[in-house]
Regions:
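C-terminal accessory helical subdomains adjacent to catalytic cores in phosphodiester-
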Residues: 1-9, 20-42, 51-160
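Helix N-cap/beta->alpha junction signal
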Residues: 15-16
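Short, surface-exposed binding/anchoring microloops in extracellular/periplasmic proteins
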Residues: 12
């Protein structure tokens, strides 16, 4: 299902299938009336491919579509520089509408701690809806704090 490009909407570009399942779990919790305002895109196949697709397939569209928001959902692979490496590639004109989120190591570690990917995604969405951060406080997710604050400000009103 594609989004209505004339209304504020959110695309999620997942690195791998585990991240796609997290995003799907999140999407299942989005308010029914807002379901078409979010779309989980096909798996990119690695964080570098997420960055490549962002640059080649999404930057121009985001420049033309002011209602578009994009979540780059990547594994941080315990790399403190991963966020900055991606953020430096985001053009300043669209930076407030691009969000970089992910598990600090890999989603598999989060799955062992919290359950299925869709269950985790669902819990993260419920936190956003209820303006709490219970699931987001997990040690493998808490590095997302700054992006989560921005996400709650810009994306939460679109989906919840």
């Amino acid at each position: 299902m594609s989004v209505n490009r004339d209304r504020p909407h959110v695309l999620v570009l997942p690195e791998d299938d585990a991240n796609r399942q997290l995003a799907t779990g999140f999407h299942l919790e989005v308010d029914f009336a807002s379901q078409r305002q979010m779309q989980v895109l096909p798996v990119a196949g690695g964080w570098m491919e997420v960055l490549n697709r962002f640059m080649t397939e999404h930057v121009d569209n985001m420049m033309r579509l002011p209602n578009r928001h994009l979540v780059l959902l990547v594994d941080f692979d315990n790399r403190p520089d991963r966020f900055d490496r991606i953020r430096t590639e985001v053009p300043p004109e669209i930076s407030e509408r691009v969000f970089i989120l992910g598990v600090w190591s890999e989603p598999e570690a989060l799955k062992q701690a919290l359950g299925s990917y869709e269950t985790i995604g669902s819990a993260l969405a419920k936190d956003c809806r209820e303006k709490i951060d219970k699931a987001w406080r997990h040690e493998l997710l808490r590095h997302n704090r700054g992006e989560l604050d921005r996400l709650n400000q810009h994306v939460r009103p679109i989906l919840f």
